[in-house]
């Protein structure tokens, strides 16, 4: 099992990042909240990973720390929640925001995420709240809820298209993704910034 990668970022195509380790390129799926904190292409990154094997694919999911990975693992144990939906959840809100929503039993923020209806949100709250009790110590620190301020990639002509594609990959319908991006689009804005602001506005 691959649990950690340390290598050079070759390409960033949200929500995917290509990391080269020892001459091998690993394609890693990352929640956007983690993706924002990655360094630029050409720089070294350390990513904690979870390896998922399916009949038709072998996928790596990456996170900036072990706590985020732990939350992802707990999420995919929930009935009806697979890796794709877990990725969408942790892209739409930070890990700390999700923990807070569960502990406060707030259904509202969860049902705004793609693929989550009221029943799924209620089930998440019940199951995850029980799991949090079984974890030793605090799963996350208050610092995990800080606004991410890492520098964004330079804007490109197709930044809006990249942002829409990333939102679709996270589970939003194409028309909905286009509408979300068009609402907050501004000249000279990077795709990462567009994605972050679109997800924030959706909540």
Swiss-Prot record:
Top-level lineage group: Bacteria
Domain III: annotated span: 155-203
A GO term, aspect molecular function: four-way junction helicase activity
Location(s) in or outside the cell: Cytoplasm
Region entry Flexible linker, spans: 143-154
Keywords on record: Cytoplasm, DNA damage, DNA recombination, DNA repair, DNA-binding
Residue ranges of the region described as Domain I: 1-64
Record SMART domains: HhH1
InterPro entries with a match to the protein in the record: DNA_helicase_Holl-junc_RuvA_I, Hlx-hairpin-Hlx_DNA-bd_motif, NA-bd_OB-fold, RuvA, RuvA_2-like, RuvA_C, RuvA_C_sf
Region named Domain II: 65-142
GO biological processes: DNA recombination; DNA repair
GO cellular component: cytoplasm; Holliday junction helicase complex; Holliday junction resolvase complex
Function comment: The RuvA-RuvB-RuvC complex processes Holliday junction (HJ) DNA during genetic recombination and DNA repair, while the RuvA-RuvB complex plays an important role in the rescue of blocked DNA replication forks via replication fork reversal (RFR). RuvA specifically binds to HJ cruciform DNA, conferring on it an open structure. The RuvB hexamer acts as an ATP-dependent pump, pulling dsDNA into and through the RuvAB complex. HJ branch migration allows RuvC to scan DNA until it finds its consensus sequence, where it cleaves and resolves the cruciform DNA.
Similarity comment: Belongs to the RuvA family.
UniProt subunit comment: Homotetramer. Forms an RuvA(8)-RuvB(12)-Holliday junction (HJ) complex. HJ DNA is sandwiched between 2 RuvA tetramers; dsDNA enters through RuvA and exits via RuvB. An RuvB hexamer assembles on each DNA strand where it exits the tetramer. Each RuvB hexamer is contacted by two RuvA subunits (via domain III) on 2 adjacent RuvB subunits; this complex drives branch migration. In the full resolvosome a probable DNA-RuvA(4)-RuvB(12)-RuvC(2) complex forms which resolves the HJ.
Name of the molecule in the record: Holliday junction branch migration complex subunit RuvA
Organism: Shigella flexneri
Organism lineage: Bacteria, Pseudomonadati, Pseudomonadota, Gammaproteobacteria, Enterobacterales
């Amino acid at each position: 099992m691959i649990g950690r990668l340390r290598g050079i970022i070759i390409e960033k195509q949200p929500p995917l990042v290509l990391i080269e380790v020892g001459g091998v390129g690993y394609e890693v799926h990352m929640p956007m909240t983690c993706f924002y904190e990655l360094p630029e292409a050409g720089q070294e990154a350390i990513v904690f990973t979870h390896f998922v094997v399916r009949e038709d694919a072998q996928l790596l999911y990456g996170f900036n720390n072990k706590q985020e990975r732990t939350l992802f693992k707990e999420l995919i144990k929930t009935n009806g929640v697979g890796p794709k939906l877990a990725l969408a959840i942790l892209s739409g809100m930070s890990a700390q925001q999700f923990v807070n929503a569960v502990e406060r039993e707030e259904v509202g923020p969860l049902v705004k995420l793609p693929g989550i209806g009221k029943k799924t949100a209620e089930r998440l709250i019940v199951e995850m709240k029980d799991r949090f009790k079984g974890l030793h110590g605090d799963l996350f620190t208050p610092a995990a809820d800080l606004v991410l301020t890492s520098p964004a990639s330079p804007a490109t002509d197709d930044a809006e298209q990249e942002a829409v594609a990333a939102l679709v990959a996270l589970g939003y319908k194409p028309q909905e993704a286009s509408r979300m991006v068009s609402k907050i689009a501004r000249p000279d804005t990077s795709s990462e910034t567009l994605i972050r602001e679109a997800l924030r506005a959706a909540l």
